[in-house]
Amino acid sequence: MTPVTFALDLQRRQWEQAAELVDRTSAASDRAETVSEVSVGKTPNEVVYKENKLRLLHYESKTETQYDVPILIVYALINRPYILDLQPDRSVVQTLLEQGFDVYLIDWGEPSRLDTHLTLDDYVTRYIDNCVDIVRDRSGQDSINLLGYCMGGTMSVMYAALFPEKVRNLGLMAAGLVFDDTGGVLERWGDEQYYSPKAVTDAFGNVPSEFLDVGFALMDPVENFVTKYVRLFENVENESFVENFSRMEQWLSDGIDVAGETYKQFLEDVYQQNKLAQNELMLDGKQVDLERLEMPILQIVGEYDHLIPPEASKPFNDLVPSEDTEVIEGATGHIGLSVSSRSHGDLWPAVSDWFAERSETGTDETPDSETEETRPDSQAEETDETPDEGLKPQAAASNETVAEEPEPQVVESNETTEEELEPQAVEANETAPEELESIDGIGPTYAERLASVGITSVSGLAAADPSEIAATIDVPVSRVTAWVEQASDRTD
């Protein structure tokens, strides 16, 4: 290339770029109208319950029949919940409705200065519990499905551990649960060496949404302050792209404050001290005992989630006694779990199938209870086991009668049935041993472990050595000591 042709080629490219700039700039004015007209959260719903700022939404059904067990979505206390109903073709709410579910959602609203002293105790044991009871009453079900997103997933775990009889299946979407050098940037920034939640709440009261927004944006500053706007300019002539971009920006800028005491409690107890994963968290004077989580549990995680890395979620399944746990991992990020086209093409159909298999009542059939991990993207490994088409009903709740009671049979006065002989084995001056599961913190799993070392009653537990038992059944000494103290109090 000669100097002349080089100069001419350079000039040609400059003119082409200038022309392209003019075209994009011209389109920008047209797209400004598009930005101002986008709408979000348009799936029809009605408010069926209100308390303080909270609204419980019930969505209009999309199918003639619905599954017996409804789904209550518990959203985070940060940002608005319409990220789950951002647009019709990328709406978690719509997807669940179209699959035949009866869907409810908690919209927390925004706390006022009067709500500064609300705690996790209030949100979990009062607000969520009241909403669950409303859904139970309306559906006629003793237990319902919970689907918690982000912080809402963490609170759903707390609730399910405190009220396991009310939760049939537990879905956790990008839920921060285990913070043992597994929580990524947020855990590092929030380390008590460098960060004091109390100092923030002392200064602000409620934590301002602007404060939270800047913190989240700084986790990926190049993407949030440069790259996404370059991408917008490059696609400004694409109306669909601009609409999607505008909806996301509307949601990102529509933040809400967080009640001060709740923020402080959540950061200190869950992030900094990892109390939830260590089974040491207390709410409303009660232990949030992970040993009570025996219901089916589904973890929905994003492979590229920089807010809640998969490592802060997946290990939780090893901390609970549930024999029916599963992980569905999508090749996306934190927000992409709810709005990306890939998630709605692969991930949410798999999630819907999981709930469907466990949301019919009235039979004894249950899905296979093996712990498994699936990846619903195109690179997922295929397995030999695939769920049968259609619905797989779950066994009836424990407090429901599956079969009719047999008619009582008349027994002659001089005859004794076999069933009547059994309780007579206890002498008149003896009482049957008290069940181990009556001790707070002991569920079927721990009861089985204790039985393996010869402890089958409360009196036997009261006489046990906590250190020896803890080492044998692989349970913290502090937990066994608490059990022994409870048992001793009952046998004194």
Curated annotation (Swiss-Prot):
<dbReference type="InterPro" id="IPR010995">
    <property type="entry name" value="DNA_repair_Rad51/TF_NusA_a-hlx"/>
</dbReference>
<dbReference type="Pfam" id="PF00561">
    <property type="entry name" value="Abhydrolase_1"/>
</dbReference>
<feature type="compositionally biased region" description="Acidic residues">
    <location>
        <begin position="362"/>
        <end position="371"/>
    </location>
</feature>
<feature type="active site" description="Charge relay system">
    <location>
        <position position="305"/>
    </location>
</feature>
<dbReference type="GO" id="GO:0000166">
    <property type="term" value="F:nucleotide binding"/>
</dbReference>
<feature type="active site" description="Charge relay system">
    <location>
        <position position="334"/>
    </location>
</feature>
<feature type="active site" description="Charge relay system">
    <location>
        <position position="150"/>
    </location>
</feature>
<keyword id="KW-0012">Acyltransferase</keyword>
<dbReference type="InterPro" id="IPR000073">
    <property type="entry name" value="AB_hydrolase_1"/>
</dbReference>
<feature type="region of interest" description="Disordered">
    <location>
        <begin position="359"/>
        <end position="443"/>
    </location>
</feature>
<dbReference type="Pfam" id="PF14520">
    <property type="entry name" value="HHH_5"/>
</dbReference>
<protein>
    <recommendedName>
        <fullName>Poly(3-hydroxyalkanoate) polymerase subunit PhaC</fullName>
        <ecNumber>2.3.1.-</ecNumber>
    </recommendedName>
</protein>
<keyword id="KW-0583">PHB biosynthesis</keyword>
<comment type="function">
    <text>Involved in the production of polyhydroxyalkonic acids (PHAs), which are water-insoluble biopolymers used as intracellular energy reserve material when cells grow under conditions of nutrient limitation. PHAs are composed primarily of 3-hydroxybutyric acid (3HB) and 3-hydroxyvaleric acid (3HV). Required for the production of poly-beta-hydroxybutyrate (PHB) and poly(beta-hydroxybutyrate-co-beta-hydroxyvalerate) (PHBV).</text>
</comment>
<feature type="compositionally biased region" description="Acidic residues">
    <location>
        <begin position="379"/>
        <end position="388"/>
    </location>
</feature>
<comment type="similarity">
    <text>Belongs to the PHA/PHB synthase family.</text>
</comment>
<dbReference type="InterPro" id="IPR029058">
    <property type="entry name" value="AB_hydrolase_fold"/>
</dbReference>
<dbReference type="InterPro" id="IPR051321">
    <property type="entry name" value="PHA/PHB_synthase"/>
</dbReference>
<keyword id="KW-0614">Plasmid</keyword>
<keyword id="KW-0577">PHA biosynthesis</keyword>
<dbReference type="GO" id="GO:0042621">
    <property type="term" value="P:poly(3-hydroxyalkanoate) biosynthetic process"/>
</dbReference>
<dbReference type="GO" id="GO:0042619">
    <property type="term" value="P:poly-hydroxybutyrate biosynthetic process"/>
</dbReference>
<dbReference type="InterPro" id="IPR010125">
    <property type="entry name" value="PHA_synth_III_C"/>
</dbReference>
<comment type="pathway">
    <text>Biopolymer metabolism; poly-(R)-3-hydroxybutanoate biosynthesis.</text>
</comment>
<comment type="subunit">
    <text>Heterodimer with PhaE.</text>
</comment>
<keyword id="KW-0808">Transferase</keyword>
<feature type="domain" description="AB hydrolase-1">
    <location>
        <begin position="70"/>
        <end position="336"/>
    </location>
</feature>
<dbReference type="GO" id="GO:0016746">
    <property type="term" value="F:acyltransferase activity"/>
</dbReference>
